[in-house]
Curated annotation (Swiss-Prot):
GO-annotated biological processes: menaquinone biosynthetic process; peptide metabolic process
Originating species: Mycobacterium tuberculosis (strain ATCC 25618 / H37Rv)
InterPro entries: Enolase-like_C_sf (IPR036849), Enolase_C-like (IPR029065), Mandelate_racemase_C (IPR013342), OSB_synthase_MenC1 (IPR010196)
Any Pfam family the entry gives: Enolase_like_N
Name listed for the protein in its UniProt record: o-succinylbenzoate synthase
Top enzyme class: lyase
Enzyme Commission code(s) on record: 4.2.1.113
Gene it is expressed from: menC
Amino acid sequence: MIPVLPPLEALLDRLYVVALPMRVRFRGITTREVALIEGPAGWGEFGAFVEYQSAQACAWLASAIETAYCAPPPVRRDRVPINATVPAVAAAQVGEVLARFPGARTAKVKVAEPGQSLADDIERVNAVRELVPMVRVDANGGWGVAEAVAAAAALTADGPLEYLEQPCATVAELAELRRRVDVPIAADESIRKAEDPLAVVRAQAADIAVLKVAPLGGISALLDIAARIAVPVVVSSALDSAVGIAAGLTAAAALPELDHACGLGTGGLFEEDVAEPAAPVDGFLAVARTTPDPARLQALGAPPQRRQWWIDRVKACYSLLVPSFG
């Protein structure tokens, strides 16, 4: 938690905006823009997706400030198990994607991609099953209840799923689906985009909580929610750079219990990053703070007009944070 909000000028003075090229289209984008803030405790990442309005993005700025200005919490483990992340690629590309996650025994597969079919999803999931023993899928709220019931049956015809992540958009839909299928349900957007992140569990709509540092407002906020949510937690990336991944690893390492692989291996989705990506070893990532490489910051710097867009965004989000600090 940020005890005192630093001056806006201090944030802008140490702000770096970068554009990271991606290996494949993910979440509909091929370049990931983030703003990085250097502070007395290290580096923080402000990477709210560009379509988010300031009211939603300000939590991401709070997270960046916390990481840059506050000491990290004590950790309980020095490495974190990660899942491979498989975008909505053709089945023939699955082997190439999984090769970036050496030793991973769990894979998260994107499904319900606009413009694709359930048959595409089945083919992709089954290709992953041939290479990785544990599979989970993420629909990003792309199905209605009836579609999700049908998809759950089709996707488990050739093997089990660890869970369905955010198969439907609303808590009510998740609760209904959970009553109708045997596959465990994980909630992501229903937690990180909700005014009340605990509502999904009170509604008995999820078996697992997927928590992300930046959208929830920082490491301390994530740990607070994890302590109160009463279901197992998976810490995941919000398509973070190496700086954001380090914050996610710290949060996962600080949890009292960690029963599932975490979605923190997404650095492999970038062609270039602000620091040398940590390579998974036997399916684990080491817990460590990350300092960007100055040469990479310069080489990956966003164009002037995009840098100004992020500066304006920081100012707008900062103004929304000020009232919280009296």
